[in-house]
Amino acid sequence: LLNLLRNPPACCRIEPVFATSRTHGYRYARKFARKLLDCPSVGLEDDPIEFQTGDIFLGLNLNHHAVTDQIRYLEVLRNAGVRIFFVVYDLLPILIPKVFPPGTDDLHDKWLKSISRVSDGVVCISRSVADDVTEWLKTNGPKRLRPLKIGWFHIGADIENSVPTQGLPDDASQVLN
């Protein structure tokens, strides 16, 4: 996200967004973005997103509950002409459920079914994950008018330009409860 914000493609304006299970729809993550970019507050709030045909929604974070709870809203976006993509990091909770907390496999399966139903495509962090998604879709994927696009990229780390954590935020006790 930081790289996209600092180096946006010429064709696009990058607007980080977020959703929770407690509210309907996605909101701009402007407070988060200002903090991430170390920018002064300029009065922009985390308002509900505005969208139009041709926009692209890229789900970078794995947030099972928020995505599955917002599936109807994502359908509204798609029906309005917004192209939707999600990053898939792995299928390990489904492939080897015994090494994850009980129920994680069902949660991951529900999330994957949701994104494969509403998305134009998924972008996987490796060719291996893309192959796993392709195989999973053969038996678990929803019926679609158009096939789900499956791409992949090499994930890596740029330690010099990363944003390291610096302890717990001031509102940690509220977040962790």
State each model region's role:
Residues 1-177:
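Carbohydrate transferase catalytic cores enriched for Leloir-type hexosyltransferases
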